């Protein structure tokens, strides 16, 4: 399967093929999460405490694309950001598992 760089497709497209490396997609998800956290008025340390995490640096790892929001934390993470958990999970799946997202929901804009 040919991989193309993310810059080669329009920003809102999720075609049927892999369009970006997983690290690039995780970074895009992290950027979105960082904006949502800022909108909620939370620091990384605040969010980590609310989620029961031992280290706030995990939030940084997720926001910088080095890790993902664990499935078991998606509901709590969404709630702490004031977002509806199912919509939050659906949005993250678009970045973390783009092919699964396309199969389940079809292509949609980010």
Task: Walk through the language-model features, giving the residues of each.
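Recognition helix of helix-turn-helix/homeodomain-like DNA-binding domains
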Residues: 52-68
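DNA major-groove recognition helix of helix-turn-helix/homeodomain DNA-binding modules
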Residues: 7-8, 70-88
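Core residues of bacterial helix-turn-helix
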Residues: 40, 51-52, 62, 81
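A short, Lys/Arg-rich alpha-helix, primarily the initiator
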Residues: 2-39
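DNA major-groove recognition helix of helix-turn-helix
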Residues: 62-63, 73, 92
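Key DNA-contact positions within bacterial/archaeal DNA-binding proteins
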Residues: 45, 56-57, 86
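Short, charged recognition helix plus adjacent turn
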Residues: 79, 87-110
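Short basic helix-loop element that most often maps to the first helix and adjoining turn
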Residues: 30-50, 76, 108
